[in-house]
Amino acid sequence: MPRTWSKILIGIIIAIVIIFLIGFLILAFSEYFPEDRESIQIEGESTKTLKIGETASIITYNLGYLSLDNTQDFFMDGGKGVRPENATTVTKNLAAVKNFIQTQDVDIYLFQEVDTKAKRSYNINEYNGIKEDFSGTSSFAYMFNSLYIPYPVFNTVGHVESGVATLNKFDVKEATRIALPSAYSWPKRAVMYKNCLLEQRIAIDGSEKELVLYNVHLDAYGAEEGKTEQLDVLMNLMKEEYQKGNYVIAGGDFNQTFPGVDQEKFPIIDTDNYVPVQIPDNYLPDGWKYAVDYERPTARLLNEEYSGTYENTQLYIIDGYILSPNVECESVETIENNFSYSDHHPVKLSIKLI
């Protein structure tokens, strides 16, 4: 009898090892390896002309794959949730965001965390949904293209295809996915975001210069050095384009607190979970500027369902813009919506090329 139990135990151990090895091999051979620069398809037709001296409007909005609304928490932020209980949450939020796009009617939308096919959002193609009724062009760049994310162990994230999307009414001459350095080492790197910039080169009426626009989603959970390196890559690109005589804007979810945020108004009250690093005070060169609404939060911690009030909620200002000296900020405003469709608020910017 003892020998029988020993054989059973050995068999169980061997089976576990085999399963582990299979999983290891799947991670190794299915990891997404994008090129440093990849040409991105531009869908649709432009409907407006960008002109120097005229106002243009932009909104950046991290959609939280339309699954992280104010009824949700998230396991990587100290909560327990992996996905909503059913697809209704996703379809409801998608309908709301489509309506938001139509009612705001701005020239450019910079969206982050847009799923095209993922277990966490019930395989709903959110990119197709948000671009469906938009009068202009659209481009999409992958940040997640993972066959299977094997955690949490008993309720895995599973398959994820997701990225950033830019909707643009102006004439986009070229769109490019630019890879950013990873903030992770293997094997975690295999199942985490492959952060990138979605660059668009926009024609300007009567000028050989271009507006170079970056849709930004920097790392949230990796090492501080990796986050700093990603920001440095972005800024070096922006400075190079400005030196060529172009106009340059970067907008999105920086996952870093902007200089000038009032730490008394938006304090860190939860040090056990996600805490964004701060961009150094003197980071920008002379003449460059942030376009940030310092009065309203752009994101919340997903350690629990939103209480409905800012009191006792961990809030951040991590979404906004960086502008080159030849781009004038006319106004910038965070549009508060009670985190109804995402864990982020949209941020609206009005600019003028000067």
Predicted regions and their residues:
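Solvent-exposed loop/turn segments at secondary-structure junctions
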Residues: 65-66, 115-118, 144-147, 172-173, ...
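Surface-exposed cleft-lining segments at the edges of enzyme active sites
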Residues: 80-86, 114-116, 181-189, 217-225
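N-terminal, active-site-proximal structural segment of metallo-dependent hydrolase catalytic domains
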Residues: 2-132, 136, 140-155, 161
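Metal-dependent phosphoester-hydrolase catalytic domains
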Residues: 3-11, 26-46, 238-249, 255-354
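Conserved S-adenosyl-L-methionine
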Residues: 138-146, 175-181, 331-335
